[in-house]
Amino acid sequence: MATKEKLQCLKDFHKDILKPSPGKSPGTRPEDEAEGKPPQREKWSSKIDFVLSVAGGFVGLGNVWRFPYLCYKNGGGAFLIPYFIFLFGSGLPVFFLEIIIGQYTSEGGITCWEKICPLFSGIGYASVVIVSLLNVYYIVILAWATYYLFQSFQKELPWAHCNHSWNTPHCMEDTMRKNKSVWITISSTNFTSPVIEFWERNVLSLSPGIDHPGSLKWDLALCLLLVWLVCFFCIWKGVRSTGKVVYFTATFPFAMLLVLLVRGLTLPGAGAGIKFYLYPDITRLEDPQVWIDAGTQIFFSYAICLGAMTSLGSYNKYKYNSYRDCMLLGCLNSGTSFVSGFAIFSILGFMAQEQGVDIADVAESGPGLAFIAYPKAVTMMPLPTFWSILFFIMLLLLGLDSQFVEVEGQITSLVDLYPSFLRKGYRREIFIAFVCSISYLLGLTMVTEGGMYVFQLFDYYAASGVCLLWVAFFECFVIAWIYGGDNLYDGIEDMIGYRPGPWMKYSWAVITPVLCVGCFIFSLVKYVPLTYNKTYVYPNWAIGLGWSLALSSMLCVPLVIVIRLCQTEGPFLVRVKYLLTPREPNRWAVEREGATPYNSRTVMNGALVKPTHIIVETMM
């Protein structure tokens, strides 16, 4: 059969299962319910909905508070070398892979792998475990940001001075550092900053350790409840509501980041901060940790291996040119990370000059930047209340759209397992409320007096780079060596009208697996047990709990392989062959098309059904 005829068969094969679904609940059509057919899934109402949702999903807190710090720590401009190697060798290929298999199969993060390779459907379960754990702790950052935002609506910022009930006799205002003679005299004593005391003694009420959980912080618990409610109402109606919310949440942070960038560049000391950020140190490339940081940053910032991008792609129309937009979104994501460094380090340079210290003494990453370094910087600027409100609104919006996109990915992956049940009526909305409630209750462990230790345990292990690298390796291995990169390229050509360059295919087959394995091994070799603030050492039971969180996702892949082999009858090699064969996209839709035979290469009791590219071949 000619290539054009094969592609026409693919087009006919998909035309029914990829229609939009204007039902009363996302993905449900009344006529489907009446006829007893599985509900069809909805689609994005416009292309911009998808673009903004993806942009909001992966342009988040890591772009602002993690990339700039890693860049300065790992050799400044020299860090961009391993960063771009991992970007083009693994980040963009895996990002596009997840989007395109979602679009091609019209399925979420679990069921797409059920169709592509049932034996390795554990990839989807691993992704859902990771994103479920991530959703529990990531939103706690937004609860902290909400608390800081509320505290910013005061004439005087509460972390600017030492005259509050939570301050200790050792509190020393940062303005004292300007007087170097006074500072040298008192620096031998253990004095602390009012910003640190506000963070540790007011916001966290930090306990001595993880084995001292203390009482619940009700103010933070209410902030956590508030952000979960916002997240719920942003996604409860499916992608048609999510696609509209991101018009604001995904664009407004860029405007505020631009304002902060302009303000930072006009401050004294900004030039020194930017030089510190980008000054290259090529010798740092000899350290394997630099390459590990580059690889893990790519996977974190592109939100891959979480099932979220696959779920977002599954709502695309079949003919949507996602390849073009994935490349543009990649430029946006990495460009935002790079520009954020100018905004952050210009302000850190100003703060270092004001305090008369080295920039290395004020540079922070993660929560240390968001809740210590930057709040301290705004107290030294004119109109500190205004800049504090602006910063924490930006932080909230950056985190919120990432959060509800990841929750949407989690929900879509789970709903697609039982579409006939969970897409009827208001069951999907009830299920979302249930998932959000459980996640909120688990998150309460992180807003106790010992909650910061629990938060760091989740952050260090549950969604660590090791887990993401593990999933990425199997994704590429299955597509390149089992399903076949050329077979997927056939589907891509049918969807977007042309075949992408071979770069993607070679990356899936060789480059990405090699980078993942190398980074995975070095991560284990360079592993350092978790500490808090470089002083508190976690007990052994907590370290064991952390590794249990990491293994809970990683073990899904081999565990599902064993379960599937045990559940399937027949000789071992026959079972393996059967489980490595893709399944039909949607049996009822296919049968309506009358495309038969499906089981011309049946392995067991007529149960084996070929994927679309094999079905086309049988119709020659």
From Swiss-Prot:
Keywords: Cardiomyopathy, Cell membrane, Disease variant, Glycoprotein, Membrane, Neurotransmitter transport, Phosphoprotein, Symport, Transmembrane, Transmembrane helix, Transport
Short name of any one Pfam family annotated for the protein: SNF
Reaction it catalyzes: 4-aminobutanoate(out) + chloride(out) + 2 Na(+)(out) = 4-aminobutanoate(in) + chloride(in) + 2 Na(+)(in); taurine(out) + chloride(out) + 2 Na(+)(out) = taurine(in) + chloride(in) + 2 Na(+)(in); beta-alanine(out) + chloride(out) + 2 Na(+)(out) = beta-alanine(in) + chloride(in) + 2 Na(+)(in); hypotaurine(out) + chloride(out) + 2 Na(+)(out) = hypotaurine(in) + chloride(in) + 2 Na(+)(in)
Glycosites: 163, 179, 190
Tissue: Expressed abundantly in placenta and skeletal muscle, at intermediate levels in heart, brain, lung, kidney and pancreas and at low levels in liver.
Domain of life of the organism encoding this protein: Eukaryota
Gene Ontology CC: one annotated term: cell projection
Coiled coil (UniProt feature): none
Positions of transmembrane segments: 50-70, 78-97, 122-142, 218-236, 245-262, 298-315, 327-348, 381-400, 430-448, 465-485, 506-525, 545-563
Keyword Glycoprotein: yes
Primary subcellular site in the record, as a coarse category: membrane
Maturation and modification: Taurine transport activity is down-regulated upon Ser-322 phosphorylation.
Membrane topology: Multi-pass membrane protein
Family (UniProt): Belongs to the sodium:neurotransmitter symporter (SNF) (TC 2.A.22) family. SLC6A6 subfamily.
Identification of the protein by name: Sodium- and chloride-dependent taurine transporter
Source organism phylogeny: Eukaryota, Metazoa, Chordata, Craniata, Vertebrata
Gene from which this protein is expressed: SLC6A6
